[in-house]
């Protein structure tokens, strides 16, 4: 293994002293950017047009990092964070910025990254935005059992740490779920097995509210009865996930969460997607609906068109595309998601789509689905779709819609599309995670004639 010299951070007293910095912009991770002795300094928590007091914590050759100590001259975009856990929880790192300011920053950062790293400039479309608070339909809470007090707490991980920050509510979680945290923690503390419980997942679905408890050993009858009683009192569905990954309803019946799409589309009846707590779903239900609607508008699927949906998951885009008449092929790398997608297609009576399991980072030349298509939809994880795009010559889609959760990989992959003769026609922000620095986007590429 190659070894490289790694310089130790400069920890001189002069560098660690508190200093004043003028912040002129944000980086794409939401940290303020200032200049100091010819270096770029990143200051999390600082905003553009602010003068702040900060302490250098890390020195590199071309940049440094600093800890915000005090805001001396605040930005007009600075607001007081509403969450009492803001300083400790690792979740909402832009709560100190107005919602309008957040979105303006994210949109500008997206355009800048695409221009800088892909040389791509497209027609910027209005951002897809929704509620700034109580937008998450799903959250995983860690459990923290204190051996001294014998009490269990629910919470989120601290920033860049495994430490659990106990919470009793959450301002970005759907209101019914946020209101459930405190009574649910009280319930868990009444269980004999409280010291051996794993994480808890809360889900707000179209068919009810769900709580999933990870258990490391079977619960006794008294504990099961307490869970069943709580479920009935609070009108929620509680299920347990065992060490084998299997799910069991506390009342003997397992109900799975469901959400609908196309329920406001005049050209089609709704589709219902069932998922298990282990499946990936977009956590912002409102934005997911508008995101799917925009993808359908851009692709304009027609009966008989062959559309390939790579990284299709359990059919979030595939089923609506098929519902509008296209012949859809969905490919996904997680076998459980493929099985769920097939079940969802069957439950919705859709026979014009086929799902395949496959490694989309591997050689795709011999895959049964590989061949000429009319249109392509990509919705990859943060790593992007670089390997899949190497097979564009065999697929030759006229249009490509790329849904991205990482602007850096989107820019890299956009360069591949541009090299293959595609032109960026539309680019827009998807504000899936308000109050955070996370940037999601949708881009439309068309093959130049």
UniProtKB/Swiss-Prot annotation:
Alphabetical list of Pfam families matching this protein: TRAM (PF01938), tRNA_U5-meth_tr (PF05958)
Gene3D superfamilies, per the entry: 2.40.50.1070, Nucleic acid-binding proteins, Vaccinia Virus protein VP39
Keywords: 4Fe-4S, Iron, Iron-sulfur, Metal-binding, Methyltransferase, rRNA processing, S-adenosyl-L-methionine, Transferase
Enzyme class: transferase
Residues reported in the UniProt entry to bind [4Fe-4S] cluster: 83, 89, 92, 170
GO terms of biological process kind: rRNA base methylation
UniProt EC number: 2.1.1.190
UniProt catalytic activity: uridine(1939) in 23S rRNA + S-adenosyl-L-methionine = 5-methyluridine(1939) in 23S rRNA + S-adenosyl-L-homocysteine + H(+)
Lineage: superkingdom: Bacteria
InterPro entries: 23S_rRNA_MeTrfase_RlmD (IPR001566), MeTrfase_TrmA_AS (IPR030390), MeTrfase_TrmA_CS (IPR030391), NA-bd_OB-fold (IPR012340), SAM-dependent_MTases_sf (IPR029063), TRAM_dom (IPR002792), U5_MeTrfase_fam (IPR010280)
GO molecular function list: 4 iron, 4 sulfur cluster binding; iron ion binding; RNA binding; rRNA (uridine-C5-)-methyltransferase activity
Domain TRAM: 12-70
Active site residues per record: 405 (nucleophile)
Binding, S-adenosyl-L-methionine: 282, 311, 316, 332, 359, 379
PANTHER family for this protein: 23S RRNA (URACIL(1939)-C(5))-METHYLTRANSFERASE RLMD, RNA M5U METHYLTRANSFERASE
Family: Belongs to the class I-like SAM-binding methyltransferase superfamily. RNA M5U methyltransferase family. RlmD subfamily.
Record function comment: Catalyzes the formation of 5-methyl-uridine at position 1939 (m5U1939) in 23S rRNA.
The protein's name: 23S rRNA (uracil(1939)-C(5))-methyltransferase RlmD
Species annotation: Shewanella sp. (strain ANA-3)
Taxonomic classification: Bacteria, Pseudomonadati, Pseudomonadota, Gammaproteobacteria, Alteromonadales
Gene designation per UniProt: rlmD
């Amino acid at each position: 293994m190659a070894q490289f010299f790694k310089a130790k951070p400069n920890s001189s007293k002069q560098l660690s002293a508190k200093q004043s910095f003028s912040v002129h912009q944000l980086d794409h991770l939401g940290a303020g950017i200032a200049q100091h002795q010819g270096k770029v300094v990143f200051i999390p928590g600082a905003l553009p047009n602010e003068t702040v007091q900060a302490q250098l914590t890390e020195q590199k050759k071309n940049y440094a990092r600093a800890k915000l100590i005090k805001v001396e001259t605040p930005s007009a975009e600075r607001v007081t964070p509403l969450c009492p856990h803001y300083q400790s929880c690792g979740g909402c790192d832009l709560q100190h910025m107005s919602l309008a300011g957040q979105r303006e920053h994210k949109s500008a950062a997206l355009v800048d990254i695409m221009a800088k790293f892909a040389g791509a400039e497209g027609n910027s479309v209005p951002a897809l935005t929704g509620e700034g608070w109580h937008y998450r339909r799903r959250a995983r809470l860690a459990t923290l059992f204190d051996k001294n007090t014998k009490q269990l707490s629910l919470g989120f991980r601290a920033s860049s740490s495994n430490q659990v920050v106990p919470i009793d509510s959450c301002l970005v979680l759907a209101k019914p779920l946020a209101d459930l945290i405190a009574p649910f923690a009280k319930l868990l503390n009444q269980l004999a097995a409280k010291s051996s419980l794993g994480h808890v997942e809360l889900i707000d679905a179209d068919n009810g509210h769900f709580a999933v408890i990870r258990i490391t050993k079977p619960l006794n009858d008294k504990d099961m009865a307490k869970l069943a009683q709580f479920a009935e009192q609070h009108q929620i569905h509680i299920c347990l996930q065992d060490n084998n990954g299997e799910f069991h309803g506390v009342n003997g019946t397992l109900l799975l969460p469901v959400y609908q799409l196309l329920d406001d589309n005049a050209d089609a009846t709704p589709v219902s997607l069932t998922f298990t707590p282990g499946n990936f779903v977009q956590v912002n239900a409102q934005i997911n609906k508008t995101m799917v609607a925009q993808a359908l508008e851009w692709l304009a699927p027609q009966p008989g068109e062959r559309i390939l949906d790579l990284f299709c998951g359990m059919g979030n885009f595939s089923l609506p595309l098929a519902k509008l008449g296209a012949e859809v092929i969905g490919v996904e790398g997680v076998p459980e998601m493929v099985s769920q997608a097939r079940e969802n297609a069957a439950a919705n009576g859709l026979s014009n789509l086929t799902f395949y399991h496959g490694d989309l980072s591997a050689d795709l030349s011999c895959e049964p689905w590989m061949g000429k298509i009319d249109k392509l939809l990509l919705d990859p994880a943060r790593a992007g779709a670089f390997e899949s795009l190497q097979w564009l010559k065999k697929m030759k889609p006229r249009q490509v819609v790329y849904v991205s959760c990482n602007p850096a990989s989107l820019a890299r992959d956009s360069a591949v599309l541009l090299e293959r003769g595609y032109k960026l026609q539309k680019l827009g922000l998807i504000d899936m995670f308000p109050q955070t620095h996370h940037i999601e986007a949708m881009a439309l590429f068309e093959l130049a004639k």
